[in-house]
């Protein structure tokens, strides 16, 4: 009674080696939103720029434990003061999968599907978007009280049918 025992538990985590120190971020401390299960998102985050807050330091074993959730909450409080509706912003690409991509702006993680990334159908989003990139995105909706941020990369690009009359005039032929 009253003694502390070590507990062994398997846990997915992100390991960042920064300044010769291992920083471990458990999966439970990574996201404020719900992301697909299975660790696929964590695996595709290699090369991403992540913000985190150190919550524990073990100097004896030369590692630290951190929380990305706390950092995201702090960033959200700061960005909630600004009105960014209908603006074009620079969003960080955090993770890219075959059908979905995770962007971060101002502490908000936003899942984008293929229809919000490109006008044309792409079988694999990883061909056009890469982890670690900074992409222009248009803010479609921003409700800070409810924690809603909706982005679109597609709306920052010109529509493929704009100017089609000059490129392909009526009566022209292509051989």
Kindly give the residue locations of the regions a language model identified:
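Single-stranded RNA-binding regions, centering on S1/OB-family and related RNA-binding modules
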Residues: 1-175
């Amino acid at each position: 009674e009253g003694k502390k025992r070590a507990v062994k538990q398997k846990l997915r985590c992100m390991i960042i080696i920064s300044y010769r120190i291992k920083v471990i971020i458990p999966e439970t401390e990574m996201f404020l939103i719900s992301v697909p299960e299975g660790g696929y998102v964590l695996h595709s985050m290699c090369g991403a720029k992540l913000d985190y807050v150190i919550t524990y330091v073990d100097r004896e074993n030369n590692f630290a434990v951190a929380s990305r959730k706390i950092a995201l909450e702090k960033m959200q409080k700061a960005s909630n003061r600004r009105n960014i509706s209908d603006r074009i912003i620079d969003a960080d690409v955090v993770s890219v999968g075959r059908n979905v991509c995770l962007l971060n702006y101002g502490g908000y993680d936003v899942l984008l599907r293929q229809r919000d990334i490109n006008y044309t159908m792409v079988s694999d989003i990883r061909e056009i978007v890469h982890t670690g990139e900074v992409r222009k995105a248009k803010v479609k909706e921003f409700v800070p009280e409810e924690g809603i941020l909706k982005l679109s990369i597609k709306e920052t690009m010109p529509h493929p049918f704009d100017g089609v009359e000059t490129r392909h005039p009526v009566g022209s032929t292509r051989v």
